[in-house]
Amino acid sequence: IDKIPTDQSSFGTGEIVGRLSAAVSEDTSVTYVKLNKNFAYIYDGTNTDSVNPPNVGQLPEGTLDYYKSEWDEYYVTTSGKRFLKEDADLTSGVGMGENPLVVNAIGNMGGDSFIQMALEDRSSFTVTPIGNDYYSGYDGEFNLDDFTATHINITFDNITSVTALPDFDNCTVFSAGEWQQVDVDGVMKFRLVLKLRQPGVYAGNSATYDSEGNLLFKFEILTNDIGNMTIVIDPGHGVTEYGYDDPGAIGHIEEAGANLAVAKLVESKLKALGVNVVRLKTESEFYDTKRRPYYARDYGCDLYIAIHS
């Protein structure tokens, strides 16, 4: 679209449109894996891959999932997710039992489309783009030549009832949605199927709990005005946690120096076009390599560029 739309919302009625039995009752003692930060790494719990896949999504701080096992630096949950131990804590309790989900509102707010929900317990979920033609390659199973998704699925764990969706008249990113009941590895779950208003036009999502304890999904509204963009540039390698420089590959020059030079050039050209650019100062500050995309999220970036050579 050409410009950010005004803030408008459609509100839910609270009418219950689906029910499921609780997977774990309130009289059952359990151990939870509880996330201790937003934008934590989430991995596929059915394999040992060290790369977090795009078909899992991001979960907010406070999310609860049932503990299944652990190995090395990971906790594995019964829903098939795997978390770094540094991103989560183990806590004892009883099963969630009845855990209703109420859809409060859908609309646009502050340059994002949003969906606001109320949950009794902060159960986990999975956000998955549907309609992409992935293929396997050197970097794994999720290589793409083009982003062609038509729908976004949000599959909720341990939810026992859901309410009717408001209309999508005031939602720019999605044109429609519906609740489905699906069987995931023998467990019945609710899935929210969201139809993209423009196929292939999707910039990901964030999920956090707001000040009133509501689950808030945000989906950035993309515009044709490059001046609305924030781009974070990450020159590869640089200062390590021990204070010395990581040069990267070494040939006639050091890779880190080449990366920094290219990053500064890209930064200057983008700024000349009116883009808000943030360059990570990897030449003077330490940024954990695995978490650099998450540092970028703190700037509300629309595009993250990691430069290597």
What is the meaning of each model-derived region?
Residues 1-231, 272, 309:
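Short linear recognition/processing motifs and adjacent strand/loop elements at protein termini
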Residues 214-295, 299-301:
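Active-site histidine-acidic residue metal-binding/catalytic motifs
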Residues 282, 308-309:
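Histidine- and/or cysteine-centered catalytic micro-motif in compact active-site loops
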